[in-house]
């Protein structure tokens, strides 16, 4: 019974962290690089001068869902971070079954500064 409770707490923590990241994504002004990539999203191409197109595609999706706002530009960053945390947690559980490694692996990933900043700022 203790393991499902730990998993629920881990998922609740991840949901709260994702909501915090979405709030920060909406509140922080866009960086010059993000504005540059937003321009890319207005004319999608299979590639750009110095980067592959994924950031432009993600910004295009976000701005079509939420409009041309800071949150629209950054929407998929925090959502992808949550998805990546879930995938890493499942991989850790598969690698070390029965040891509760999934929530620990996801927590360690989310504790890194670069992952936290990179999940809010939409740059490649």
Q: Where on the chain are the PLM-derived regions?
A:
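Transmembrane signal-anchor helices characteristic of membrane glycosylation enzymes that use polyprenol
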Residues: 6-30
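Short helix- or helix-capping micro-motifs
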Residues: 14, 105-113, 117
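Loop-to-helix entry region of an early transmembrane alpha helix in multi-pass inner-membrane enzymes
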Residues: 53-57, 67-86, 102, 118
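Extracytoplasmic catalytic/substrate-binding loops of multi-pass membrane glycan-assembly enzymes
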Residues: 26-37, 47-58, 67-71
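Membrane-helix interface segments
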Residues: 6, 69-71, 95-104
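Transmembrane-helix motifs of polytopic, lipid-linked glycan transferases
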Residues: 11, 75-96, 111
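Short acidic/glycine- and proline-prone juxtamembrane loop motifs at membrane-interface regions
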Residues: 120-124
């Amino acid at each position: 019974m203790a393991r499902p409770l730990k998993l629920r707490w881990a998922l609740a923590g991840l949901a709260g962290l994702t909501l915090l990241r979405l709030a920060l994504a909406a509140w922080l002004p866009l960086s010059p690089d993000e504005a540059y990539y937003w321009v890319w999203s207005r004319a999608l191409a299979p590639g750009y001068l110095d980067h592959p197109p994924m950031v432009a595609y993600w910004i295009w999706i976000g701005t079509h869902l939420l409009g041309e706002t800071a949150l629209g530009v950054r929407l998929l960053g925090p959502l992808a971070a949550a998805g990546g945390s879930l995938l890493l947690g499942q991989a850790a559980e598969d690698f070390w079954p029965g040891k509760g490694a999934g929530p620990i692996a996801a927590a360690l990933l989310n504790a890194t500064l670069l992952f936290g900043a990179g999940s809010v700022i939409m740059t490649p």
